[in-house]
Curated annotation (Swiss-Prot):
Taxonomic lineage: Eukaryota, Viridiplantae, Streptophyta, Embryophyta, Tracheophyta
One GO CC term on file: cytoplasm
UniProt protein name: 17.6 kDa class I heat shock protein
Alphabetized UniProt keyword annotations: Cytoplasm, Stress response
Annotated sHSP domain residues: 38-153
Record family assignment: Belongs to the small heat shock protein (HSP20) family.
InterPro entries the record matches: A-crystallin/Hsp20_dom (IPR002068), HSP20-like_chaperone (IPR008978), Small_HSP (IPR031107)
Compartment(s) where it occurs, according to its Swiss-Prot or TrEMBL record: Cytoplasm
Length: 153
């Protein structure tokens, strides 16, 4: 039975909270997390990185972004940088906005790739809001098998 949840959500909705059905909330509107939620999706771009036998593959969910709004760069020889920016739509002075829920803002993520990554062969593609970056790996040198020879004598 805490009032703290009202700081983080716009309405209490716990059926076990006897005050959840109260229509008056003295804290409503004092602290708003809307600006944080507004840009959270873009600022905290989530990226998966997996290593296959042939390559390092990074996938980023960037819903609603165009490939022109995203950059993939190599810095300092081994650092892969993925960045982007989504701008708000231009407002016409006669427009009346009822809700603005789509996020806008910038993001930047950097990944230091291991020595076996071929940084000069990085490829990136964007399809259906998912950016896929493929960094091929250098082939591991096959070490000759060492066979021990018994010494007689």
């Amino acid at each position: 039975m805490s009032i703290i949840p009202s700081f983080f959500t716009s309405k209490r909705s716990n059926i076990f909270d006897p005050f959840s059905l109260d229509t008056w909330d003295p804290f409503q509107g004092i602290i708003s997390t809307e600006p944080a939620r507004e840009t959270a999706a873009i600022v905290n771009a989530r990226i998966d990185w997996k290593e296959t036998p042939e390559a390092h593959v990074l996938k980023a969910d960037l819903p609603g972004m165009k490939k022109e709004e995203v950059k993939v760069e190599v810095e300092d020889g081994r650092v892969l940088q993925i960045s982007g920016e989504r701008c708000r739509e231009q407002e016409e002075k006669d427009d009346t906005w009822h809700r603005v829920e789509r996020s806008s803002g910038k993001f930047i993520r950097r990944f230091r790739l291991p020595e076996n990554a071929k940084m000069d062969e990085v490829k990136a593609m964007m399809e259906n809001g998912v950016l896929t970056v493929v960094v091929p790996k250098e082939e591991e040198e096959k070490k000759p098998m060492v066979k021990a020879i018994d010494i007689s004598g």
